[in-house]
Regions:
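Hydrophobic alpha-helical transmembrane segments of multi-pass membrane transport proteins
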Residues: 32-36, 40-43, 66, 86-101, ...
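Membrane-interface interhelical linkers
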Residues: 1-29, 60-87, 99-100, 130-139, ...
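Loop-to-transmembrane alpha-helix entry segments
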Residues: 79, 112-115, 128-151, 155-165, ...
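Glycine-/small-residue-enriched transmembrane alpha-helix faces in small-molecule transporters
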Residues: 2-53, 57, 90, 98, ...
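Hydrophobic/aromatic residues within transmembrane alpha-helices
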Residues: 44, 51, 55, 102, ...
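Alpha-helical transmembrane segments of compact multi-pass small-molecule transporters, enriched
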Residues: 58-62, 114-128, 143-144, 199-204, ...
Length: 300
């Protein structure tokens, strides 16, 4: 069982095979949690800005008790992380707002397809700024995933979806940047950045939102979207970045773009077409093969 305080701490972990396997498990679990966002948003039935505001507000409210519980350690992390924590918060806030807006402009499958670019941008940025090595099998897995992504795009593009996909690409840039920042400062806990991002994104959304229109029947879905889906997924992803390279964590995150349309298909009847399913299967196979090959590498 994963303890919340161990994720909030998120100090640098060892580079053993066991630690890397745990990091991969965290990344996969985070992707599975993130993949539920589309189906949850579909059940809220509020304008995008309202969803963005309440998602941020509930994140701030629910995370605060945990941060206060760990306040001594949190203040140490805040002082140690310095500008990196603020940069992480700004990048996360940008992704929070852009993601909800993208879902309001395009079908879930189209939005998630854009997230397929995340591991490539992350891996390149990590190589340039952190000097992280890219193994040949990881590069091959990324190339195969590009093929799957291209097939999915061919099957999923719809009229009017380009605007949503363009906004989704902002999410990709923000998340890739955050992965690199968190990986760079893996010596400190970056959980406060999630809370601060909620504050920033809530303030950005407030002028465009009408919070008073929310109904009690929508509150459970908002709670599932915010502390459940958003905070839980981010804590797991940040924990994974303490144990595995940023590019590998982002590659495993591709599972989100495959699972997301599946949940919407199963629960809302928004069925992706055959090319989207074929492309998604290729992406899953590439990610799975990369994990398997990583597991066969000598520890160290």
């Amino acid at each position: 069982m994963i303890r919340i305080h161990s994720l909030l701490d998120m100090k640098t972990q060892g580079s053993s095979r066991g630690s890397a396997a745990l990091g991969a498990a965290y990344a996969i679990a985070a992707a599975a949690i993130f993949s539920t966002a589309g189906v949850i948003v579909r059940h809220i039935e509020l304008p995008a800005w309202d969803v963005s505001f309440w998602r941020s507000a509930f994140l701030v409210i629910t995370m605060l008790p945990f941060l206060l519980w760990q306040q001594r350690r949190i203040w140490i992390d805040v002082r140690s992380a310095g500008p990196a924590l603020l940069l992480s918060a700004l990048l996360l806030a940008g992704s929070f707002v852009a993601f909800i807006l993208a879902l309001g402009l395009a079908p879930v499958a189209n939005v998630l397809i854009m997230f397929g670019a995340t591991p490539f941008i992350t891996a390149i940025a990590a190589r340039l700024f952190l000097g992280e090595k890219l193994h040949s099998h990881t590069i091959l897995a990324m190339a195969v995933a590009v093929v799957g992504l291209a097939i999915s795009v061919a099957g999923s593009l719809q009229a009017g979806a380009l605007a949503g996909m363009a906004v989704a690409f902002i999410v990709v840039l923000c998340m890739s940047g955050n992965y690199v920042v968190v990986r760079h400062r893996r010596d400190v806990g970056m959980a406060p950045a999630i809370w601060l991002a909620g504050v920033i994104s809530g303030l950005v959304a407030l002028p465009f939102a009408h919070p008073e229109t929310v109904m009690w029947s929508q509150v459970p879905w908002l709670l599932a979207l915010s502390p459940g889906q958003l905070a839980g997924g981010l804590l797991l992803y940040m924990a994974s970045l303490k144990r595995i390279p940023a590019g590998r964590a982002a590659l495993l995150g591709l599972l989100e773009l495959v699972l997301g349309p599946v949940w919407v298909w199963l629960f809302d009847g928004e069925k992706p077409d055959d090319l989207t399913l074929i492309g998604g299967s290729i992406v899953i196979a590439a990610a799975a093969a990369n994990v398997w090959l990583d597991s066969r590498r000598p520890a160290g």
